[in-house]
Amino acid sequence: MNSYFTNPSLSCHLASGQEVLPNVALNSTAYDPVRHFSTYGAAVAQNRIYSSPFYTPQDNVVFGSSRGPYEYGSNAFYQDKDMLTSCRQNSMGHNTQSSLAQDFSSEQNRGNGQEQKGSIQIYPWMQRMNSHSGVGYGTDRRRGRQIYSRYQTLELEKEFHFNRYLTRRRRIEIANALCLTERQIKIWFQNRRMKWKKESNLSSTLPGGTGAAADSLAEGKEEKQEDSEGQGKE
């Protein structure tokens, strides 16, 4: 059986073998008598005290392939465990940073879209567009023009041909017959009278058009009479 103390290749071989060991006194507390290599035997192996647990080669592969077999101990185990935990934390931190970057980019795009919507200039014609349907951009909510059917227009023209001014009772009757409101009937007759006045003024400018002036005077008297009658009934 060869050993470091019986190998002739060693230049520092001595008979006692104590000089190979560190230069420490035998009675020193730092010197471990169990690790004295001059004696061998089963009794010494049984009484030998290990300061660190024994690890199998499998543990060496799992927890640290870069470590030598002499570097393993309780501290090495905890260091490997800390390295695994730090790697997991770094990967989780990287994923969190990527998700935060995506959220920030989506919020930035959303903010840019809102700024573009807010920077659109609204013109007056855009405010009046589709205001009767409540889809206009501005606060100017104006009523749209009432579109009358051909039947309604024909009946109103017949009534205007006989009576240019209507009493309130007659307005209610026509409104019920034509499925219109009293206000719509009143507005239609006002617009129709304005149109009739324009036509009469054009005819009065022509020679022999004195009758139009008399008709306009009579119209003014009838309009005043209609207004006074409507106020008295209301």
Curated annotation (Swiss-Prot):
A Gene Ontology term for the protein's cellular component: nucleus
GO molecular function, one term: DNA-binding transcription factor activity, RNA polymerase II-specific
TM annotation in the entry: none
Any single GO BP term: regulation of transcription by RNA polymerase II
Keyword check for Magnesium: no
Name the UniProt record assigns to this protein: Homeobox protein Hox-C6
Compositional bias of kind Acidic residues: 225-234
Role, per record: Sequence-specific transcription factor which is part of a developmental regulatory system that provides cells with specific positional identities on the anterior-posterior axis.
SUPFAM superfamilies: Homeodomain-like
